[in-house]
């Protein structure tokens, strides 16, 4: 749904968030990041233009999960110097 633009962002969970993020990043067009705290959630959107956030149900409690999601959904991609990195990721996907 994220790749087809039916939705803007996705949220994935597994035990640690690691396995599901690895699997999600195999899908062309997805930039998924595991975040266990709010600061990383904000920066992965601002600097990496992540469109999926993943976290671990065994790692993150419900209140912390809400804080993480608030930061992720409230952040905007900054572009600029970060656009080069995103372009490199997209180039690798297209190989």
Language model features: what each stretch is:
Residues 1-9:
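Short alpha-helical segments enriched in small residues
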Residues 10, 30, 70-72:
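General secondary-structure propensity
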Residues 12-58:
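Mid-chain, well-packed structural core segment of small domains
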Residues 38-95:
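C-terminal binding/interaction regions
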């Amino acid at each position: 749904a994220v790749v087809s633009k039916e939705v803007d962002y996705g949220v994935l969970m597994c035990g640690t968030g690691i396995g599901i993020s690895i699997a999600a990043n195999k899908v062309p067009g997805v930039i998924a990041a595991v975040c266990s705290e709010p600061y990383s959630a904000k920066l992965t959107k601002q600097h990496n233009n992540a469109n999926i956030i993943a976290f671990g149900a065994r790692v993150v409690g419900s209140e912390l999960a809400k804080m993480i999601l608030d930061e992720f959904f409230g952040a905007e991609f900054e572009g600029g110097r970060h656009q080069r990195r995103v372009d490199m990721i997209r180039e690798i996907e297209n190989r």
